[in-house]
From Swiss-Prot:
Keywords: Glycoprotein. Glycans are attached at residues 14, 325. Belongs to the PHYHIP family. The keyword Glycoprotein applies. This is Phytanoyl-CoA hydroxylase-interacting protein. InterPro entries: FN3_dom, FN3_sf, Ig-like_fold, PHYHIP/PHYHIPL, PHYIP/PHIPL_C. The gene is PHYHIP. Interacts with PHYH and ADGRB1. It comes from the Eukaryota. Residues 6-115 form the Fibronectin type-III domain.
Amino acid sequence: MELLSTPHSIEVSNITCDSFRISWTMENSDLERVTHYFIDLNKKENKNSNKFKHRDVPTKLVAKAVPLPMTVRGHWFLSPRTEYSVAVQTAVKQSDGEYLVSGWSETVEFCTGDYAKEHLAQLQEKAEQIAGRMLRFSVFYRNHHKEYFQHARTHCGNMLQPYLKDNSGSHGSPTSGMLHGVFFSCNTEFNTGQPPQDSPYGRWRFQIPAQRLFNPSTNLYFADFYCMYTAYHYAILVLAPKGSLGDRFCRDRLPLLDIACNKFLTCSVEDGELVFRHAQDLILEIIYTEPVDLSLGTLGEISGHQLMSLSTADAKKDPSCKTCNISVGR
């Protein structure tokens, strides 16, 4: 049987967090003969591994020939925000069950995308299921080392400046390494209604009245839901003043929450005053997208311990947790 030509001019398009479309060019004489495609997909750092030594052995992905471009989809082998290399081979399945195969095409590289809004909506729904009842609170707080606040006063005009979010949480979160903001907490002790006296982030705490950051002029977005191989679960929320740069970033990427009615963090008017509540059973990480003036709050030293084991800095999400994972790339 006549040999197959080698596929060439590989094109990868329509890339999402767990799928892509691929097409290539092959000789017209092969179009009617080819019955299968072999697709060799590798994470970029391993792009030279796992090439099969024998031309007649199928590679990782085997697909029946379909009109191109074809969609490759599967969260079991594709992860978001990950660089891959891909090469293809065409084949004709013969009557004896063996394959006549072409040579390998050139290798091309691409990077998968972030979670889309519909994926984040699935995470949001999972987080809502364990959020628990709502508790009242009155302040947002941020713990850090004394030198951090001294630097803000001396070199930043008494302002806490937004910084780039790290890679903690879900690997597919569109905020990681992209959104600038100032991190705050709001969780309170069940028995006192006050912020806890322990913190993993430093012994100095800046507290600011909740209404300074969260009010009807603020948009609230759901950004992530994760755990770190422990029983604790974290939800990341974004507070962005309406029309701000951070608000424009979030608008196209994150689910928007009703500030007065959601399962995580609310601001509502009761008896003519703003009342704030947070979910009891989630540790909330709040990202405020604008600079924060230290003169709007108070700074003091906490009496508890610095619990480093609870730090979420660059924390990796547990990919096996059924509570906080969805059926797309982790």
